Amino acid sequence: MLVPARGVEQILVLGSGISVSSDAIQMADDLGVEVVFASYYGKPLARLIPASLGGTVRTRREQYYAYNDSRGTDLACSFVRGKLKNQASLLKSFAKKWKGQKEDLWREFRANSSRIEELIPRLDLIKGQVELVRGEIMGVEGMGAEIYWRTWARLIPDDWGFPGRDYPAARDQINSLLNFGYYVLEQEVWAATLYAGLDPYAGFLHADRPGKEKLVYDMMEEFRPLVVDRVVVSLAKEMRPGHFQDDCRMTKDGIKIASSAFYGRLDESITYREKRQILRNIIRSQASAAATFLRGERPCYEPFTPRW
């Protein structure tokens, strides 16, 4: 299949034994297209970044300064606030389907959605340098995660034997799907931070670790429920045990199905801020919004929280 070069936003080289010509890499650089090399199961291994995406000095300088002032804490709280709101929204969206039919599930999902939302005001009370208050912020996120994953598990057919969210290893098929989806989301957020001129390694919510893109992990948080978790619920009904190997990694056919679903989700359009927008573009807009906040060009960072 031929694809117009100017219509390509990212090249993903998945698996081993695949070569990319130097001419193709040169063209990708000229067009500002990132080339990502990933394992057969989607885990990123290396990236070729176009020279033009090095970022502006001012944006990155302000990003580093923000770690030691209120902006760092504001951003970290905003990322968690967005995640909690979207977790609650996802549970509410599934609860609607059961109203009048499965009242016990409807009440359970509505109640737990409200419990997650009730955690959000706690973030408004957290002040101070992010290094000192990170534990408080992550504590709020953790309380929400406990409620969310326990409830979300009810959406997965019993046949899969989903044991709950497993960090970071995947010893079952559903966690394998979640991890694969997060790898896909990670590539998209990584590209968005580069286009916005940000340093993907200098985060706020997640503590620094050599070689880990902590700002990417930060900015993924608000998108996880609606870009990945929602898709996995659908895949759990579409896929079969035969799409997985004995070690719970997907087969080639399984990867094709999962890839199509996750990338298809990124290309979906939703109503956000009173207009139809593609999710992939919203991710880039959010990265740009974070950059403008850090530069002092907007008073706050508003996380992605669409209405359902």
What is the predicted role of each segment?
Residues 15-89:
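A surface-exposed, charged beta-strand/loop segment in the N-terminal or early-internal portion
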